[in-house]
Amino acid sequence: MLEDVIKETNDKLRSSYEVFLSDLKGIRSGSLSVSILDGVIVSTHMGKLRLNQVASLSVVNNKMLSVQVWDKSTVGAVKDAILTSNLGMNPIVEGSVLRLPVPDLTEERRKELVKVLKKYGDRAKVAVRNIRRDAISRIKVLEKAKEISENDMHALLKKIDKIISEEDARIDDAVSKKETDILKV
């Protein structure tokens, strides 16, 4: 019973952290990667799809990305999605290929990216607090139903708080590393 609460909490935290890391990949740092396009959603005749579901993405060089659209009828939608993605990219259309010149990161843009990064970090911490709240309420329900003793409840609450503190530290560490990477010229 006690292990179930711990395991469920750890599983939820792991899942939440993976979402947080995927958000971080979408923030551009010093080196260029196609992962900055992960958040681009394209409206197609099949509904809303991620960019990597309608095109092949590649890095041409340090300042250029290439998007090879599979269905020529979606080229316009892909271009619009990139323009409205707030990435600061202006696609050049060459048939079914879009070239994305990636501007150098200005000091101002770096500061904006750090703000976005911190927002993601705060959102991840809110998710962690919600997971903690759920675990605590579940533990208290178990104690009220006399399925666990009061001593077990307190021990479990301490264990949950320790796990949550470690997760907060992991989030802070990831934010700090990414911030250093963004601000590095």
From Swiss-Prot:
What InterPro entries does its record include? Ribosome_recyc_fac, Ribosome_recyc_fac_dom, RRF_sf
Cite a single GO MF annotation. Answer: ribosomal large subunit binding
Localization per record: Cytoplasm
Biological process (GO), any one: translational termination
GO CC, alphabetical: cytoplasm
- From what superkingdom does this record's organism come? Bacteria
Q: Which UniProt keywords apply?
A: Cytoplasm, Protein biosynthesis
Instruction: Tell me which SUPFAM superfamilies the record gives.
Output: Ribosome recycling factor, RRF
Bilayer-crossing regions: none
Role according to the record: Responsible for the release of ribosomes from messenger RNA at the termination of protein biosynthesis. May increase the efficiency of translation by recycling ribosomes from one round of translation to another.
Record-stated family = Belongs to the RRF family.
- By its UniProt entry, which PANTHER family does this protein fall under? MITOCHONDRIAL RIBOSOME RECYCLING FACTOR PSEUDO 1 (PTHR20982:SF3), RIBOSOME RECYCLING FACTOR (PTHR20982)
The identity of this protein, by name, is Ribosome-recycling factor
Q: Where does this protein come from, organism-wise?
A: Neorickettsia sennetsu (strain ATCC VR-367 / Miyayama)
Q: Which gene encodes it?
A: frr
